[in-house]
Amino acid sequence: MESILSLLRGMGIMHLELGQALMMLISLVLLWLAIARKFEPLLLLPIGFGGLLSNIPEAGLAMSALESLLHQGSAEQIAIIAAKLNTVADPVAIKEALANAVPSVQNQLEVMAGDMGYNAGVLALFYKVAIGYGVAPLIIFMGVGAMTDFGPLLANPRTLLLGAAAQFGIFATIIGALLLNWTGIISFTLPQAAAIGIIGGADGPTAIYLSSKLAPELLGAIAVAAYSYMALVPLIQPPIMRALTTQAERKIKMVQLRNVSNREKILFPIVLVTLVALLLPDAAPLLGMFCFGNLLRTSGVVERLNDTAQNALINIVTIFLGLAVGSKLVADKFLQPQTLGILLLGVVAFCIGTASGVIMAKFMNKICKHPINPLIGAAGVSAVPMAARVANKVGLEEDHQNFLLMHAMGPNVAGVIGSAIAAGVMLKYVSALM
């Protein structure tokens, strides 16, 4: 009888908490959105499944070695960790002290937990390698670069301004997050506000990379918000685009783009990364990998590497990245008032980015000889190529002969560059204040 009771006590369901059950439900919703609604399935499916695994009681798949010790360790072992942190031997107090400890102390305690026989879960290992070291977002950026054509941007360089204008949503959202903190509604630090703001760039890898550096505790919510809003581009953008433009503006036909030589396409990524990296070294990792991937494409001499970068490699890394992000969808980190603030600020950032791109295009029409259809300004957010397709679709609704797709790809690609530079700016100046 005792063995049966022991078996029952060891079942995960006997230790299931309300928060874990709720997070498992949220993970199932993400899986439903990915499979049934096809909302960013390449990321939301592994994120949702990773979240499901992370919240299985007693499995410890998303726990580090130290977290496993705090969850399963003896009183003596917990007391040793508490003494190192000068706090009481209570797991809750230890976690609070850990959050304020310097990285060197955290690493030392992780090693101690490993020496005591505790190991990190598989999802925690994925997170440490893929996101903790910043590897996965950078490799994905390389793959995106290999799939990107700079031709439309080079054929119409002024669309760089549209991509730059769309980044206004990022900085406006940082101000919004700090205002929420100042009013006492929701508490956000400056690094957290910067990490949330990058959602406005509609660039998932950049959002993950920046939040892993500035606010890793918010990474799960930021990643889910970023990819969810990217999937909702066809729903979020059109009402804003129509509200800010007249019917006549939406019917503007742009001049045919010139042919861009292969030499220009080869030189552009080299010149771009050199200039930006010399001026803003913190943007070099993201932009460097993006430009390297593009050079694989345009050089025409490494077709095997180009094919691997934009297919097999990016697909493999996407799996590990999604599962790693899912490891952060645990109840004690996700079910916080900050999560609601992130979701609200994220959609505000996206809307402001869309609107600022359209408004910039309208302003440019006042001073430029050749008119720009303001709809392509909305493509300045870096959801490639979804935002460009939406601009083209809205334009075709007004005039069935007005094809804007290639024109919209210019600001769309500029948005990717802009979001990487914005991330570099925040890494440089926010990190200096931390």
Curated annotation (Swiss-Prot):
Q: Keywords, A to Z?
A: Cell membrane, Ion transport, Membrane, Sodium, Sodium transport, Translocase, Transmembrane, Transmembrane helix, Transport
Instruction: Cite the Pfam families for this sequence.
Output: OAD_beta (PF03977)
Please give the Gene Ontology molecular function terms for this protein: decarboxylation-driven active transmembrane transporter activity; lyase activity
User: EC number(s)?
Assistant: 7.2.4.2
Membrane spanning residue stretches:
13-35, 122-144, 159-181, 186-208, 223-245, 266-288, 308-327, 339-361, 403-425
Catalysed reaction equations from the record: oxaloacetate + 2 Na(+)(in) + H(+) = pyruvate + 2 Na(+)(out) + CO2
**Record's GO cellular component terms:** plasma membrane
Q: Classify the source by domain of life.
A: Bacteria
> Where does this chain mainly localize?
membrane
Q: According to its UniProt record, where is this protein located?
A: Cell membrane
**Cofactor(s) of this protein:** Na(+)
Q: Name one GO biological process term.
A: sodium ion transport
Q: Which family does it belong to?
A: Belongs to the GcdB/MmdB/OadB family.
Function of this protein? Catalyzes the decarboxylation of oxaloacetate coupled to Na(+) translocation.
| Protein's name in the database | Probable oxaloacetate decarboxylase beta chain
The organism that produces this protein has a lineage beginning with: Bacteria, Pseudomonadati, Pseudomonadota, Gammaproteobacteria, Pasteurellales
In the UniProt record, what gene is named as encoding this protein? Answer: oadB
